[in-house]
Amino acid sequence: MEEYQVFXVYLELDRSRQQDFLYPLIFREYIYGLAYGHDLNRPILMENIGYDNKSSLLIAKRLIIRMYQQNHFIISANDSNKNQFLGYNNNLYSQIISEGFAVVVEIPFSLQLSYSLEEAEIVKSYKNFRSIHSIFPFFEEKFSYLKYVSDVRIPYPIHLEISVQTLRYWVKDAPFFHLLRLFLYEYCNSIITPKKPISTFSKRKSNPRIFLFLYNFYVCEYESIFLFLRNKSSHLRLTSFSVLFERIYFYAKIEHLVEVFTGDYSSTLSFFKDLFIHYVRYQGKSILASKNVPLLMNKWKYYLIHLWQCHFDVWSQPGTIHINLLYKHSHFFXGYFSNVQLNLSVVRSQMLENSFLIEIVMKKFHTKVPIISLIRSLAKAKFCNVLGHPISNPVWADSSDFDIIDRFLRICRNLSHYYNGSSKKXSLYRIKYILRLSCIKTLARKHKSTVCAFLKILGSEELLEEFFTEEEEILSLIFPRTSYTLKRLYRGRIWYLDIIFSNDLVNRE
């Protein structure tokens, strides 16, 4: 909750002079310090660069003045690579401005939820719901009794103005939104060309934090209307609504519910359930599941289609949403392939002189590691080839032995930590093997030796045993090493409550 306190202090300083307007905060130097000092989206191998002297208040003010002096409507697409506003270093300057906008617009929503949590007296318990893995126990408990499932991908808003207008219902500051529009148009002109059109809200590493914020606000509006339709279409009371969240960037309160969002839309988890339907969302993807006839699923399917078309002007066709039998369909969700498998058991029962064979069908929730996509990601990161054969990483060969081993171990631990919930660990062990051998080959390359010769010089492989023994060591701290519980947990699924983000290797489809 430290970020809320920082936001509260800075906002209170301006309230007495600016009457809650966000526009003056754009010219506050500490805003850009917050933007660079609280960067939680960096990759696992990147260090926090912090707030450097490049992102100074003077640069920000000059860029904003240029925005006002320039008519963005007359910029031709052919000049998009030489953006007049962004100057000679458009990537740096646009990042500075966008981070400042994001921090400013997130402040009131952070404060709003902070006050809501304090009133509800759940500030101390909110951390229990931060883990991405918190959703899978819900799957294990409920999905075994369901029959139909539908994967729904939430479409991107067709125009930035839709998201900006949605935001204006929450924040009343015309000068701020005028400046925000100027920046958004400038940025779009700099990245979109006739030869290479792209979606502004698509998941790209170069996308500023402000676009992720606008996308989440768009999803907020969509889910609030969806929840309203659910309440109006059913006479039954909503039995439960839960929100699971991780890194917190901004919040919103919808009537009596607290909806939680993050700066990265890949981090929001929410679900509600009643006697008929279950709804789960993670990233820009949601899942509808039901144990009843497909009629109810079709009803909600067309509800969503009409909602996107009529309220958000987003064209979507019914054919894009498919309704499948849960035990025949494997859906990709939160980095796992999940499905419900039917296990058939035969029991012999004897009554007097007659014996009977009774077939019992058991449903069990299974999770699988997406081995193909993970190998593709490892190949892109130069840890193996496209066939999954380990190779040396030439980029890291110039580092010290300790740094090389530490980097490989961090990746291996993160992947192992995230995928310990898989039903079968064979794929996870294969990923560990690729990283382990890639580490050895990288060390051998650095010392200009072969793998066999390097291992002989090393004398043993004890230095690299952590690739395979970490989970057992962690569990042995809780249970005796010889206990049956430890062996059962090590072989079974383990869901962690400290998974607060997923990196690109984990979260790639």
Swiss-Prot record:
Q: Name one Pfam family in it.
A: Intron_maturas2
Give one GO molecular function term: RNA binding
Q: Where is it located?
A: Plastid, Chloroplast
What InterPro entries does this protein's entry cite? Domain_X (IPR024937), Maturase_MatK (IPR002866), Maturase_MatK_N (IPR024942)
- Keyword presence, Flavoprotein: no
- Alphabetically ordered keywords of this record: Chloroplast, mRNA processing, Plastid, RNA-binding, tRNA processing
The protein's predominant localisation is plastid
Q: Name one GO biological process term.
A: mRNA processing
Q: List the GO terms this entry assigns under cellular component, sorted alphabetically.
A: chloroplast
**What is the purpose of this protein?**
Usually encoded in the trnK tRNA gene intron. Probably assists in splicing its own and other chloroplast group II introns.
> What protein family does this chain belong to?
Belongs to the intron maturase 2 family. MatK subfamily.
Q: What is the protein name for this chain?
A: Maturase K
Identify the species of origin. Vatairea macrocarpa
Its organism's taxonomic lineage begins at: Eukaryota, Viridiplantae, Streptophyta, Embryophyta, Tracheophyta
